[in-house]
């Protein structure tokens, strides 16, 4: 989130309730005296909760060391590294206790059908994680199918425990995968022409042309960068149950992308369960067919001033 203040943590600092209200305060000038008027709409719409504010000037990094999109690629790389480190710690703990846990479960009755179904499930999950570059490769070969004739009780017990451990080792990647999957789908499905986004455990994310050439992040159009920055911040940085404020998402954005914007935001909200999303926009294309959920600040504030 492109804010004025940044903590040492990669997660950017959110604005508080009072700062947001002050940012959108309404000014009325009479003679040479300036007065600030609070908006009843903003007071009612923005609860005293944690706020995430995505400003209009969002492409440039505050520290001017890297562009915002380059910082985001590094941020995703750090998330992947953290998940890998957590997975490694889980692996070490489970591997060291495997013999003892195996003896404890030796008398459990496990069917070959159950084993086979779980093997297929974990195989699919690994393939998805590898597809997005979250994990590199399968480090252990697991047979895909077993039959009642070839799978004895002792093998069932070992495999069942192994599968349970394998799933737990992959668990640190679960939430990250859901976010990456949505991020990639939103970009590849709706806005990227002649290129696609790639996820990497070496680069975070990068873009590749249809002919396989890597595209520098700085060579993306301003519209593409604006959209990517918004999606990334909402998916990977904004916190659950927070109130989201987005200022002028239409900046540099193609009209077709503007019409898709609210649908994309709805998908992100479903994943991250935001409390509320408020968007300040001048674009009827952003609103699209959703005028029933809009509030005209100019019109309503003029009415309030006339009534004073």
Predicted regions: what they are:
Residues 90, 121-124, 154, 165, ...:
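Alpha-helical protein-protein interaction elements
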Residues 75, 89, 101, 158-161, ...:
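Exposed alpha-helical structural elements
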Residues 1-147, 192-203, 300-308:
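P-loop NTPase switch/coupling surface
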């Amino acid at each position: 989130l492109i804010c004025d203040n940044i903590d040492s943590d990669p997660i950017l600092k959110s604005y508080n309730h009072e700062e947001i209200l002050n940012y959108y305060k309404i000014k009325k000038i009479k003679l040479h005296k300036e007065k600030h008027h609070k908006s009843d709409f903003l007071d009612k719409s923005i609860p005293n909760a944690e706020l995430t504010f995505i400003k209009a000037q969002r492409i440039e990094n505050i520290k001017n060391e890297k562009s915002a999109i380059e910082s985001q690629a590094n941020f995703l790389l750090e998330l992947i590294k953290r998940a890998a480190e957590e997975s490694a710690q889980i692996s070490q703990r489970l591997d060291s206790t495997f013999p003892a846990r195996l003896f404890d479960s030796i008398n459990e009755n496990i069917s070959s059908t159950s084993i086979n179904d779980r093997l297929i499930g974990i195989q699919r999950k690994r393939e998805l994680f590898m597809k997005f570059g979250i994990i590199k490769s399968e480090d252990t070969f697991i047979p895909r199918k077993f039959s009642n004739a070839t799978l004895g009780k002792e093998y069932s017990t070992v495999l069942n425990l192994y599968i349970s451990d394998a799933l737990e080792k992959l668990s640190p990647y679960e939430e990250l995968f859901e976010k990456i999957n949505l991020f990639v789908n939103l970009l590849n499905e709706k806005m990227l022409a002649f290129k696609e986004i790639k996820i990497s455990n070496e680069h975070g994310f990068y873009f590749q042309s249809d002919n396989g050439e890597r595209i520098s992040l700085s060579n993306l159009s301003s519209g593409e960068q604006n959209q990517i920055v918004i999606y990334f911040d909402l998916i990977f940085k904004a916190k659950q149950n927070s109130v989201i404020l987005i200022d002028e998402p239409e900046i540099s954005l193609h009209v077709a992308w503007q019409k898709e914007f609210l649908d994309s935001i709805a998908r992100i909200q479903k994943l991250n369960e935001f409390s509320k999303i408020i968007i300040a926009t001048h674009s009827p294309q952003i609103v699209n067919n959703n005028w029933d959920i809009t509030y005209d600040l100019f019109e309503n504030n003029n009415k309030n001033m006339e009534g004073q």
